[in-house]
Amino acid sequence: MQIDEKLLSKLEKLSALQITKNRNETIVQLSEIVNFVEKLNELDLDSQEITVSTIKGGAPLRIDEIRNSNVIDEVLDCAPKKQEHFFVVPKIIE
């Protein structure tokens, strides 16, 4: 997948985000990363045994910690348009 100015412009419109030009150049570099990841799809893994975990006994568990978090407010503060606890975006499906 080639990430170019045209694709970025389309994604910018669909996501209702505004990407600055200097940030735009950085995002175009994602094309190289995506191309590398696409090469991974070319690997023949049919002869490889499926593994779930490299740690004996599974992944170590962690203790759940209760934290007071205002994640919703923090995320909505970044939105160009919001209404109550929702993002406001233009209709894209007719």
Curated annotation (Swiss-Prot):
Keywords: ATP-binding, Ligase, Nucleotide-binding, Protein biosynthesis. InterPro entries: Asp/Glu-ADT_sf_sub_c, GatC. GO terms for biological process: glutaminyl-tRNAGln biosynthesis via transamidation; regulation of translational fidelity; translation. Its EC number is 6.3.5.-. HAMAP family: GatC. NCBIfam families: gatC (TIGR00135). Belongs to the GatC family. This is Aspartyl/glutamyl-tRNA(Asn/Gln) amidotransferase subunit C. It comes from Campylobacter jejuni subsp. jejuni serotype O:23/36 (strain 81-176).
